Amino acid sequence: MKITRSRCLILSFVLVCGLVPEVTADVEEATDGLSTTQEPIWLTDVPATVELIAAAEVAVIGFFQDLEIPIVSVFRSMARQFQDVSFGISNHSEVLTHYNVTSNSICLFRLVDDQQLHLNAEDIENLDAAKLSRFIHVNNLHWVTEYSPMIAAGLFNTMVQTHLLLMMKKTSPEYEESMRRYREAAKLFQGQILFVLVDSGKRENGKVMSYFKLKESQLPALAIYESVDDKWDTLPIAEVTVEKVRGFCEGFLKGLLQRDHEAEGDSGKEEL
């Protein structure tokens, strides 16, 4: 199957740039809804730091030689903003040495693709709350990550090139059980496929469904694609099960496609 390269560019445009105003709205909404309870965990030794990182899908650690610099208070505020991220902070030499820290730095540890993303001293020097919030938003990828334009930017910035989308309404009675199974399936493809939820109940997500030529009547459905290639496929499903998701993913990775998109032509391609 061959789809033109322009279609890959259209996909990235639809996912990342199609709803730019909402990116700002996401940050503002999260900032407005800060919790006053969560604080970073003070890490005084290596075992505690290792344990925190290992137990979290996403962990952000502030390694600071100087706790008086302005970014420290900004960092602490992030822990109140991102409730699904584990935050730690340390200025202990043993911890800094273990992680090869030679200057103030912030590191995001991510389980789903076993990645470590660093903001070094030079980055931190010009960092403010908005920039740090965006860094965490973009890279906050979990076993299952809910789609947003900002998250899409992170998806296209990862080493994992195959992404699976589950398109269904979060208000569906089957949502909770479907997500449990979807998450279970995601763990089978760590480092191979990133799993994403697209809430089809949001009108603004209609462009994502249109790109994959899916109608409301076909949902829930799976859509899978490679971010740097021309391969993609879809599978409407009446019920989300681990077996169905695993079979669809394994088939795609082996080059087995459910639909012949070449035969469909480019009639469904959107020029945005």
Curated annotation (Swiss-Prot):
Subcellular location: Endoplasmic reticulum lumen
Pfam families to which the protein is assigned, alphabetical: Thioredoxin_6 (PF13848)
Chain ranges for the short sequence motif Prevents secretion from ER as given in the UniProt record: 269-272
Glycosylation sites: 91, 100
PROSITE patterns membership: ER_TARGET (PS00014)
Signal peptide: 1-25
Location of the region described as PDIA3-binding site in the Swiss-Prot/TrEMBL record: 230-233
Domain Thioredoxin: 39-152
S-S bonds: none
Keywords attached to this entry: Endoplasmic reticulum, Glycoprotein, Signal, Unfolded protein response
Family label: Belongs to the protein disulfide isomerase family.
Record's function text: Specifically binds unfolded proteins and may recruit protein disulfide isomerase PDIA3 to unfolded substrates. Binds protein substrates via a hydrophobic pocket in the C-terminal domain. May play a role in the unfolded stress response.
Name the UniProt record assigns to this protein: Endoplasmic reticulum resident protein 27
Gene field: Erp27
